[in-house]
């Protein structure tokens, strides 16, 4: 069953799965600081269990972005006129490193 989830969107860096993995190998503390300072939240659909800190590739306009799960969305976060898109694939959990 699909659920709505709130995610933190990495707008500038990392911009791809490859860039995320490279940065987590070389400068993981910087990625965690970017995550902690990030307040750009969007809502997506998810089929998986909602686990805070799970990192996914997500559609973002005509591109994709790296996002980290924050929490399950409240009903007040969901607008019926918006067509929410599902997260593409899980790649990591930023809080378990």
Model regions and ranges:
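Terminal, basic amphipathic appendages of nucleotide-handling enzymes
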Residues: 2-21, 29-97
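Extended active-site and interfacial segments that coordinate phosphate-rich ligands
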Residues: 25
